[in-house]
Every structure is written in structure tokens, then in C-alpha cells.
């Protein structure tokens, strides 16, 4: 029977066998992977994660085994799923895209190493002590697209130069406040007014987009939020129906009919989470691994959508695109 580090959910101590020592006796370490959505939602992300993990010498079914847990969109299930992984005595927990899950893990699990992916400021949310020296047992990646709002606003201004008002779709329950603050400044700098559209559920999406069309506001900036990403095809379709010129934060919107996107590479983000997981399995300490942000940004353009909207994409914009859908 494999000897493992026993870890109590209520803050108990670990029988501190280094993972490298245990790996010599039985090479199959166990990683718990907790997704906030369904497994199918993570297909491409998981591939990228495993590519990053393999870079460090760990392959599923060989050097490492996996315990997968899926919340199926029910964030309130995350604490239960985390408890289950602790009972399974995993060596590492990966929370690739849930701020709520990461905060719960921080509170519940004081010793098992945790790699997170979040859109929140990790210091302000209490996940780590600092970006460079996280302290504790958590580290990971931050996918914050708020800093790119001015660039997206500028893109909208280039596409609809005569517009005086820009719509901003945000979820006030998540990262909406940050998007609004940055968006207001970006709009002012371009001499534009900002029309804020608050959306907290999928039922609000068609109402918000219809409201913008009723007010004859054509440019739309879709904020960074998991709710919008899950319903990206619906949002892209509604925007097209209302003849809105919309800019998004991820290329996946463009691949399902959205006009244009600019943001961090999502697959690169998950690949780096895999690299960090591997480094920790090699006994590096989360406390010493700086919280990272993506370094690669990409633009995607759907020319078919542009034609349907009657929008001309400037050559200067086309020249910088990483993906162009004809």
C-alpha cells in the first residue's frame, strides 16, 4: 500500500515525506484537478495543461495519476469536491479557473500544494501574501484582461469612428467593478461615453443586448467573465442580429461568430499552469514560485462577420491579427 502524506482538512499536520522520496518508491503521484464547469468544457484546456505538465517530465498514467472533479457550473459544490480530494490524499490540487474555489481551498486546505488560475488580484483576494513571494501553499496564474480594456476600446473606436457611446457588458458579481473603472477612463480618453450593462445571469444577456440596440448604441465591449464565456455563442449571435460591433477578450468568441477579440492566449495560460504543477511535483515550494501573468496576447478577426455587419477592418488592424477567419 502506498504511503502518503496524510493531510487533515481542519489544518492538521503532514507526515512530511518529500514527494520526490515517495516517487522513488511508487512513481505514481496523484493530482486532484477541480473544474468549475463540465469535463467537455475543459477539453482544449486540459490538453494544454498536460502539455505543460509533460514539459516537466510528468505524464498522466505514468509518472502521475489524476483525480478529476467537475462542478458542472455549480460553484457551491466546489468545497465538497475539494473535501473529497483531501480524503483521497492527493499530492497536489489544481484549480484552473475558479476564484471562488481557490479562496475556499485557501481556507480549507493548509498543507496540500495548490496551483490556481484566477482572474482576481491574488493579494487582494487573500490567496497569497505577495505576487513575488506567495507564502503558504498556493501559487498560480492570473488571467486578468482588465488591463487590456483600453486596447479593446481603441479597436472599437477604429471600427466605428463616428460613434459617441460604447456599451460595456459586465457582471457586477465578478470582475465587473474593475472593468468599469478602467473602461470609464479609456472611454474618456477617447472622448466617448460609456453605457454600462449589468448582467448577472444568462437570462439578462438578451435583454442587455436588446437594450443597447434600442438606444442606438452600436459598439459593444464584452467584459471578461466566465458567464459570458460559457454563453459566448449566444452572445455573438445576438450581437450579430442586433448589428452590434462587438469586441471580446478571447478568440473563442470569434471562432463562433464574434467579430474581433484581443486578449491573452487561454491555452498558453493553462499550459503554464501545467508547468507550475510539474515544478511543484518536483518538490519546488508554492511559497517560492511567483504568481505569473500571461506574456502572450493574440488578436482574432472574423471577416465573414465583418462583411455581414458592413464593417471594414483597417489594414493596420488586419496586419496584427494572429487568426483571420475568412
Residue ranges, per PLM feature:
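Short hydrophobic alpha-helices and adjacent helix-cap/hinge residues
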Residues: 1-326
Amino acid at each position: 500500500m502506498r504511503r502518503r502524506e496524510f493531510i487533515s482538512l481542519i489544518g492538521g499536520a503532514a507526515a512530511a515525506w518529500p514527494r520526490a522520496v515517495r516517487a522513488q518508491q511508487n512513481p505514481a503521484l496523484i493530482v486532484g484537478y477541480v473544474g468549475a464547469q463540465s469535463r467537455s468544457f475543459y477539453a482544449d484546456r486540459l490538453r494544454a495543461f498536460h502539455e505543460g505538465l509533460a514539459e516537466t517530465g510528468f505524464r498522466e498514467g505514468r509518472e502521475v495519476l489524476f483525480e478529476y472533479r467537475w462542478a458542472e457550473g455549480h460553484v457551491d459544490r466546489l468545497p465538497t469536491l475539494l473535501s473529497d480530494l483531501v480524503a483521497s490524499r492527493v499530492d497536489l490540487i489544481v484549480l484552473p479557473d475558479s476564484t471562488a474555489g481557490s479562496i475556499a481551498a485557501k481556507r480549507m486546505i493548509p498543507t496540500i500544494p495548490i496551483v490556481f488560475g484566477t482572474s482576481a488580484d491574488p493579494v487582494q483576494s487573500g490567496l497569497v501574501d505577495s505576487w513575488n513571494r506567495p507564502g503558504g501553499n498556493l501559487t498560480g496564474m492570473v488571467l486578468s484582461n482588465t488591463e487590456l480594456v483600453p486596447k479593446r476600446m481603441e479597436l472599437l473606436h477604429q471600427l466605428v469612428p463616428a460613434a459617441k457611446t460604447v456599451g460595456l457588458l459586465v457582471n457586477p458579481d465578478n470582475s465587473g467593478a474593475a472593468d468599469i473603472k478602467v473602461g470609464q477612463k479609456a472611454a474618456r480618453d477617447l472622448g466617448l461615453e460609456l453605457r454600462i450593462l449589468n448582467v448577472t445571469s444568462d437570462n439578462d444577456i438578451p435583454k442587455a443586448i436588446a437594450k443597447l440596440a434600442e438606444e442606438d448604441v452600436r459598439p459593444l465591449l464584452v467584459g471578461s467573465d466566465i458567464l459570458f464565456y460559457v454563453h459566448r455563442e449566444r452572445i455573438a449571435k445576438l450581437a450579430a442580429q442586433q448589428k452590434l460591433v462587438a469586441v471580446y477578450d478571447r478568440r473563442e468568441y470569434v471562432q463562433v461568430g464574434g467579430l474581433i477579440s484581443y486578449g491573452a492566449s487561454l491555452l498558453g495560460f493553462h499550459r503554464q499552469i501545467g508547468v507550475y504543477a510539474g515544478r511543484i511535483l518536483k518538490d519546488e515550494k508554492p511559497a517560492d514560485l511567483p504568481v505569473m501573468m500571461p506574456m502572450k496576447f493574440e488578436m482574432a478577426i472574423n471577416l465573414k462577420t465583418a462583411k455581414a455587419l458592413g464593417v471594414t477592418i483597417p489594414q493596420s488592424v488586419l496586419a496584427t491579427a494572429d487568426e483571420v477567419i475568412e
